[in-house]
Amino acid sequence: MTMTDPIADMLTRIRNAQSVYHKQVEIPASKLKRELVDILKREGYINDFEYIDDNKQGILRIELKYSDNDEQVISGLKRISKPGLRVYAKKDEIPRVLGGLGIAVVSTSSGLLTDREARDQGIGGEILCYIW
């Protein structure tokens, strides 16, 4: 069976693993997912990730992050642009998530960027998801 929205599947796997306090979660890999997970690591939402080559498409093993008193670092993940309804924003229309406390992941001509990076570079694109 084919997957219609691999990004939504990845976000759901992370959300489900965090809700039951798993230390790590494995998801099928792709270039886009790798870039998205790299943003999560750079922004401090996950500890680390590694790519495992299984001679097929590969697997991304994501090490989830919790605070000292076992609270989830990621409190919310929301898919914005979906296969049935794409959402685009110009450079001056890129949204702020929770007044700047969260991030919006934007797919641009320069690759995946956070909302801040896209605003700084002055480029718009497709709003993939919100993370807070």
From Swiss-Prot:
Q: Which UniProt keywords apply?
A: Ribonucleoprotein, Ribosomal protein, RNA-binding, rRNA-binding
Q: Name one GO biological process term.
A: translation
UniProt-recorded Gene Ontology molecular function terms: rRNA binding; structural constituent of ribosome
Coiled-coil residues: none
Extract one GO cellular component term from the record.
Answer: ribonucleoprotein complex
| Xref: Gene3D superfamilies | 3.30.1370.30, 3.30.1490.10
**Protein family membership:** Belongs to the universal ribosomal protein uS8 family.
Q: How does it assemble?
A: Part of the 30S ribosomal subunit. Contacts proteins S5 and S12.
- So what does this one do? One of the primary rRNA binding proteins, it binds directly to 16S rRNA central domain where it helps coordinate assembly of the platform of the 30S subunit.
Can you say what this protein is called?
A: Small ribosomal subunit protein uS8
Species the sequence originates in: Natranaerobius thermophilus (strain ATCC BAA-1301 / DSM 18059 / JW/NM-WN-LF)
From the UniProt record, report the name of the gene that encodes this protein: rpsH
